Amino acid sequence: MLSRLFQCRRLRFSQRVGRRVLSLLVLMGLPLAAQAEGFDNLSSLADKGFIIGAQAQLLGSGESLGALDPTRRLSPASVTKLYTAAASLDRWGPQHRFTTQLMATGDVDAQGVLHGDLVLDGGGDPALTSENLWRLVQRLRERGVRAVDGQLVVSQWRFGPVTCVTTDRCKARTRSDNAYSALLSSAAVNYGSWCNRVKPGSAVGGEASISDCATVAPLTRLDNEVKTVAHGGDTRLSAERISSESGDTLRVSGQIARDSFSREIYRASSDPAEQTAKTLMALLEQAGIEVESYATSTTPPPTTAKRLAAVDGKPLQELLLRMLNYSNNFMADTLALDLVAKPRAELQDAGDALMRFAQELPGHGVPTLASGSGLTPENRVSARDLNALLAAMYQRSALFPTFVAGLQLPTNGPMHFIRRGSDTFQQQVMLKTGTLNEPVTVRAVAGYFRTQTGRWGSFAVLVNGTSQTPYLAWRQVLPLVAADLTEMIKSR
């Protein structure tokens, strides 16, 4: 009995010494790739050639629970959005709203005719929708405006069109089969994407019906190759937006069952400011306000222009919830561009603003950030950098509730692919993931956790491939991270 008691005490002593040695190594900044204490499962990926940086710590005390090459800077992919969210909260606070306004370059006469241009001043709202534009039009009617003898001008003077720096966005200038590559403008609406609704036709074998989600009448040319099939049939749709000198064309093919509900299709537009102009022109026409033509502009409204109507967007806290939960690239890059003070901002200006914010955080090194979304593969941060960011936001009592609310719990978050690992991991970890497949594989995850005794911790894991490594699915990575974090959570 005494021998067993002695062995237990010796084991506990060895564990305490091991943890102290690990903490000392971390404080000294020594690499821990060879001693992956706390990340034993994750470190197995190194045997397959993947480059890994990881660190987990208790907040408040700063005690390290595990580290694996924590100072190595790697691509974080969409985990970059944590910097965008933090910098936005630091700049504006949770209740900030972006304002979009309609301005007049002339006067409105007694008959309701505006003698001049009607200017939409894009305020950089990352979630401006057709509904917001409809409200602007209704407020314009309330002011008695019935016609404009000039033209509608959509001003994107703050930023836009933003130079593309990633392959997907550069391709989107001519064609797009997705919405995540949407181009950027301070006057963009509906996340820079066309939304069209596909409904079954009136008879089997006939053409399906396609309409704009907001204005009903299509705002682009349509190449409709969707057929209506019998009740109970499969619904399969494929859509691509193609652009030419004459504008955007949406090519939709496939089939939709006669008893199917309508399906919505989102595809990035080739010119977000022009998309806004076309949408607003249609809404003005529906409201009975006559405008003959439209134009887009990169100059501010004249200083003599008068405000006729304005609409405030959703509070920043709601924007961040959507941006982080759904990893919305358009919203993230728009918010990062909003951080730039000068007009005609480009993505690198936004990256510079984020880097300045990051370098002011205690314990943070010098990152490389070329965008706020993480779409740019040049972005580089370390696991220690991310933990410094997470620790700094944890200390900001007025901002932390909004910041952490944007992270997902695997057990009930909107993204189902993270529902892996133990119940402890799924219910006690709040995280943001990042994924890139080109030019190399990136799987990154960072966030917070609660220990068994209720203490808060933070963690960051960066896994980057090389040209020689195989494809890496989340189902291969997340269970390893979950197993390691589960042990840490249970140990405290």
Task: State where each predicted segment sits.
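Bacterial N-terminal signal peptides
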Residues: 21-31
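A short glycine/serine-rich beta->alpha loop
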Residues: 68-74, 266-267, 373-376
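Conserved serine DD-peptidase/penicillin-binding transpeptidase domain
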Residues: 39-42, 91-364, 483-492
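Small-residue-rich helix-loop
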Residues: 65-67, 336-492
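Beta-lactamase-like hydrolase cores
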Residues: 34-76, 99, 134-143
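Active/ligand-binding-proximal structured segments within catalytic/core domains
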Residues: 75-88
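Short glycine-rich loop/turn motifs
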Residues: 51-54, 320, 332, 443-446
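N-terminal secretory signal peptides that target proteins for export/translocation
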Residues: 1-16
